[in-house]
Amino acid sequence: MPNDRDELPENARQQLDDLFRSDPLMDQLGAELLMWSPGNAKVQATIEVAHTNFLGGGHGGIMFSLGDIAMSFASNGYGRQSVATQIDISYHRGVRPGDTITATASEISRTRRFAHHRVELTVNDRLVASATGTTYRTDEWILGPDIWPDEWREKY
């Protein structure tokens, strides 16, 4: 459902989208940004043999990284530079090479300084891991302050 957070300035939306899609770790993992809006994001990747642990299962670090990437796009989607300060993850099911993992980050709450997110990682709509995380919202604006209207900067 659209809301006022989705009303980013068009030039800012495109530049943020380009920036998010250039994420080096996302590229290294072969992941794809499916969607983002302020406070929300969805990232997807298929587990490859290079993503496995010594037992042959998908490495938990890959799932953690996908969740962290999704949360970073959700929290930075307002244009204010945000960095993760804490992430807790629980692994519910193993994953194998060939499994496609979708990491969906959703904002739980946000203040001027901190935002809290829930991240669900699924394979075929089945929950394989879940996480919660906190981001610190700096006073710096991605793309510089001039691209963001005053009312946007005051509100977000």
What does each model-found stretch correspond to?
Residues M1-Y156:
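Terminal targeting signals and extreme-terminal segments of soluble enzymes
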